[in-house]
Regions:
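C-terminal boundary/linker of central alpha/beta nucleotide-binding cores
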Residues: 1-71, 81
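Extended alpha-helical scaffolding segments used for macromolecular assembly and cargo binding
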Residues: 76-161, 165-170
């Protein structure tokens, strides 16, 4: 335990994410000194790596340790909140595939449905159907039937998959 509490907390809160940039580190951790912490970690440790000046990731063995430590120290509620903040970051960046992954990991079914509805309301050429297919298909039929937008999205997804009977069903 050679790190002080703010650095340990910062590390644990970034552990769920494969890679991150400074903006995501700030948003997920809520730490206004995220840039200083990243700089310190890069200078004085070997646990943090970067692909370019913007994209950081942990050495895989250290990330596994951080995730284990996070599971021990954080409540399920706290872990869900981290995934929710990560999902919001990706949503604001319009990276819906990663946003859905985060919201699903955090158990936020309402946000998953909201993103799928928003996607279905886009012009068909602008939708992200391939990236979101597993999330559409995981929705309960009753939930799809309750939303004309989700029915439209499922119909489009089925048509794009050459499942014309399924498309007609929705």
């Amino acid at each position: 335990r050679r790190f002080d509490l703010p650095v340990r907390r910062f590390l644990l809160e970034l552990a769920p994410f494969e890679s991150f940039d400074l903006e995501m580190a700030r948003m997920v951790s809520g730490d206004p000194r995220a840039g200083e912490r990243l700089d310190w970690l890069l200078r004085y440790t070997t646990m943090l790596r970067y692909d370019d000046c913007q994209c950081f990731h942990f050495w895989s063995g250290f990330r596994a340790f951080l995730r284990w430590e996070m599971d021990r120290e954080y409540t399920e509620e706290k872990r869900k909140a981290l995934f929710s903040r990560g999902g919001l970051y990706y949503e604001l960046k319009e990276d819906y595939a990663h946003a859905l992954e985060c919201y699903t990991s955090g158990g936020d079914h309402a946000k998953v449905s909201e993103l799928l509805i928003r996607n279905a309301e886009l012009h068909p050429g602008m939708g992200h159907y391939a990236e979101m297919e597993q999330y559409y298909r995981a929705l309960p039929g009753a939930e799809i039937l309750a939303s004309p937008s989700l029915m439209q999205g499922m119909s489009m997804l089925c048509a794009l998959s050459a499942d014309y009977d399924g498309s007609e069903h929705w």
